[in-house]
Amino acid sequence: MTRSLLWQMVIVLGAILMVNYVLTTLTPQTQEPVVDVSYSRFKTELAADNVAAITFEGNNVVGNLRERTILNRVEGTEEVQSFLRFRTTMPPVTDTRLLDDLEQRKVDVKVRPESKPSPWATAMIYMLPWLLIVGVWWFVIKGMRTRQGPGGGMMGGFSKSGAKMYTKERSRVTFADVAGLDEAKQELMEIIEFLRNPKKFMRLGAKAPRGVLLVGPPGTGKTLMARAVAGEAEVPFFTISASQFIEMFVGVGASRVRDLFNNAKKNAPSIIFIDELDAVGRSRGTGLGGGNDEREQTLNQLLSEMDGFEAHDEVIVMSATNRPDVLDPALLRPGRFDRQVTVERPDWRAREEILKVHTRQVPIDEDVDLQIIARSTPGMCGADLENLVNEAALIAARENAQKVTMQHFEQAKDRVLMGTERKLVMSQQEKRITAYHEAGHTLLARLSPGADPIHKVSIIPRGQALGVTQQLPVDDRYHYSRSYLMTRIAVSLGGRAAEKAIFEEYSTGAQNDLKQATDLAEKMVCQWGMSERVGPMSINRGEEHPFLGRKLASDNAFSQHMAWIIDQEIEKVVKAGEQAADEIIANHLPVLKKLADALLEEEVLDRTRVDEVLRETGIEVQDDPAAHPDGDHVLQGELAGGAVEG
């Protein structure tokens, strides 16, 4: 039962009780109450000539006395109970003298027929509880149908897929709203063209792909691309989330898959879009419990519908996932998902186009340069950029500004990349520790060859960090050398080295730095073959989660001796980074103190101010950072700039 329906019933019941209370309490009681007495008491009052009138109703006698008479006394008090009207029951033995006594004492005698309930009324009394139960049940069913909508309701609606159908008029998103995904748009436009004009392809013997799988990290625009296809295609577009197939009853998932494809076939040519495919498409044969069996039944039905005995060339299936590694191999074979369209993070040119799309409805000032913003946000995907524009607009609205300026975008970027500024009260000693910690990161980042340029360093608490040193590469990186990675590790440990040099002890502020350095060293040794002792090997160590659909338990594909070697090599890499950080800090202690003093005074330093401080101490810095090589994309944006938290 829905909450609104329940409240309606409570209100109606409360109104009925209120009306009954008003009628019973506020209505004046003018009639004398009737008191039940014994037949002997009735005869006694009759003998005393105190009965004025009586009425016979079957075996019952109701009468009035001439004078009020005491009924009884309350023990222990002076209070008495009296009555004027009475009621009694005739005995089963006939009293032959009663009528003579009544006539002799001139008692007004009336006779009424005994009232018997109507058969219909009796039937209604017995049926009323059942009618109430049926009525409540009907309200419950109606409420569930209203709440769940099409495909919901009770038993009959569980087999409905619940997919929403979009037409060109209903979907307002087109490819013009999708920027930076030219390759993916080209792949999908070919499919849309096939549905619009199939003869163009069929005359050459070409067949449309049965399925298209959109693969990419979260936030890169996979679902947005599907919305654009719905807006561009001149055919019905059915959309559903894969999690909607699974229900509390066994067999519902397979039934909903059949219903979805039946609706698509009735409206062919059409497109089906299944979002988050990994919810039902995980590899079969693993997992425990009935829920896993239900998911496998749903997956089997999906496989059969996509490429079974019945052909459906005019129904194309699209899907999106960010976990293609856990999908069942049968889903990815030709004939089902023929094409896998990779939706990657955009480069700076694509980011500029995405910013243009998201700023269409935002009044921006003339000083806003979207190209500068795009270049200063490496690694950001479409969702991140949309959030960046929204944050800038919120900041401008908070300041009652008429337009969004470049300063608002800078504040929004700091909020997104470094976290929300916190009003945390810190002691002077803790501020000094934070300042030297961030100065250590900054000094390592500015003096280490090949390091990413400093964008901003702050000792204002943001997010969960007490201070942040932000580095941004000049351009997007797709290839990382060993020397660059070693520099990243050294920069991560620069804050810890500064604390040791100044305060001669370590603090807990380097917790996140140590984690970053260790994770990076582990990837260098285990995945990228950058260890001479381990060699050119790729070793899965602590990455795979066995319960994601691949295995029932984790196992190591290497010996205990190799595990010991890996630990030694990871420690060696981290120690090398620590040694490099210690050397740079030890050789530039005056510069470190100068940077820390500037941070304590100004709290936030940008790259220009950092370079000014370095020049004041006699260190010449290059304006143009070391160039980095281009090549294959290795880290997929994971190291494309970042913030070192103190």
From Swiss-Prot:
Organism: Syntrophotalea carbinolica (strain DSM 2380 / NBRC 103641 / GraBd1)
Gene that this polypeptide is encoded by: ftsH
SMART domains assigned to the protein according to its UniProt record, in alphabetical order: AAA
InterPro entries assigned to the protein according to its UniProt record, in alphabetical order: AAA+_ATPase, AAA_lid_3, ATPase_AAA_core, ATPase_AAA_CS, FtsH, P-loop_NTPase, Pept_M41_FtsH_extracell, Peptidase_M41
Gene Ontology terms describing biological process: protein catabolic process; proteolysis
Cytoplasmic compartment segments: 1-4, 142-646
Membrane-crossing residue ranges in chain numbering: 5-25, 121-141
A cellular-component GO term for this protein: plasma membrane
Protein name per its UniProtKB record: ATP-dependent zinc metalloprotease FtsH
